[in-house]
Amino acid sequence: ELYRRALQMVSPCTQIREAISLIMQSRTGGALCFGQPKRLADLSEGGVEVDTAMSPQLVYELAKMDGAILLNHDGTRILSANKFLKPKATIPSTETGTRHRSAERMARQAKCIVVAISERRNTVTLYVGERKHVLDSLPTLLNRASQVLQTLVRFIDALNEALEDLSIREFQDMVTIFDVCRTVQRYERVRRISREMEPYLLELGVEGRLTSLQLQEVMMQTAGAELVVKDFYKDSLKSTSGQLLDRLAEINQEELLKLGNISQLLRYGPNPRTVATYLSSRGYRILTQTQRLTPQLIDNLVERFGSLQQILRAPKEDLVEVDGVGEVLAERIRSGLHLLQNQLALERR
């Protein structure tokens, strides 16, 4: 949470970023510390008390002095300037320069945010607790975010292809564990790539609004994909699909490439030979694609019939017996399922 807040504070078009830009242009260098006043004061000495509202121009002027500038936790007030930072020298640091070494140790000891601006290299390094991040220029950030977005679109296309194939097989009652594991694998890849966009969007701030909208638009295409886990989990689903996907997110990239690991997560065992086993879908995902059924109605249908095939075969009289389903809705469910089945068949041709 602190790291997210730090990236937002130094994103383009913020007052802190404007102050950083002014310092970089003058090539004077500097260090800005953000945190609790008492904690920062205990780990620094000397300097002058300022205690005034923060402004980029004032920070720029104060940075002309050699010492660090201390600000409150959200950077809205300047506490003091020209401070000598005195974190423990025993704290390990990978930095070589005096300013950056002190900044890294200060961030680690005080669990605060420190921005170090190099006067020679003209770079900005962000230290947040144990984390370190070198800020990129706006064009570089936009370019990297665009590359990740293009990669994401390709993976979403592959996921949608797998989902369409899975839907056809669900109607045909010919789904194998391989089909399910492949789809879940592609969905998890999409989730991981989409998460890679988050730090770029945070660092871009308002400059990343267009990229954020593009991300939201492409991710809308994956709506309902998480229900694949709910449809094919072997045992009665005591955990939510979200909890199962959280467990999937914990495995590393190499393990994700092995379908046996996904099969084991779904409780079909780790043996790769099991991927030839046929499964029957419960129908959650398909039902969400037909008429606009509420989650409760879908739960009632699955609880009553147990599988998509049983719902497809159920006469109107049986559907009406489900809690919340009347004659009109029963007919819409039947016609909606058959319409979706025909659409998938036509698209496949």
Language-model region placement:
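Divalent-cation
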Residues: 1-255
